[in-house]
Amino acid sequence: MRITISGLPGSGTTSLTYHLAEMHRLDVISAGEVFRQMARERGLTLAEFGSFCEEDPSVDKLIDERQREIALSNTHIIAEGRLSGWMIQEADLKIWLKASLECRVRRIFDRDQFSDLTAAMQATKEREACEALRYQQYYDIDIGSLSPYHLVLDTEMWTVEQLAIIVSSAIQTLQKSE
């Protein structure tokens, strides 16, 4: 089973991905973790690294191509990343997670230890605008389009455990139909 989990920053993609991976013994490829690690290695914030990626498209493309290669060579995997649902068209189940900007900013504030919510809001808006522009320029993808996704879940409505139950039900249904 190949699964993709996508969503905007702070929507809960990483939390759900690792929860499901443990439940279903699936390998994980996380574009966001790779992106954050590359930013840290360069001593840049996510917004700064996003701007750097605007200047050097090879970084984004490298992450996306590597994720696709690994996903296609493995049949028991969850690919987590903003574009995973677009890039891994062969996935059995493509999920988009959504949450309000305010909710996502609170999560990002807690996760990334911003000095205040205003700074987290500003950084999140800058990052999202930068990413949307890059995806449109590089791949002609409108990140706001949900067209490739089979399942859209609101992460403000349910806990990660409840979301995992919903997704597990979809996985079981797909496995029965194979």
Curated annotation (Swiss-Prot):
It catalyses: CMP + ATP = CDP + ADP; dCMP + ATP = dCDP + ADP. The gene is cmk. This is Cytidylate kinase. Belongs to the cytidylate kinase family. Type 2 subfamily. It comes from Methanospirillum hungatei JF-1 (strain ATCC 27890 / DSM 864 / NBRC 100397 / JF-1). One of its GO terms (biological process) is pyrimidine nucleotide metabolic process. GO terms for cellular component: cytoplasm. It is found in: Cytoplasm. The keyword ATP-binding applies. Its EC number is 2.7.4.25. It is an enzyme of class 2 (transferase). It comes from the Archaea. Pfam families: Cytidylate_kin2. Keywords: ATP-binding, Cytoplasm, Kinase, Nucleotide-binding, Transferase. One of its GO terms (molecular function) is CMP kinase activity. Coiled coil: none annotated. ATP binds at G7, L8, P9, G10, S11, G12, T13, T14, S15. Its main location: cytoplasm.
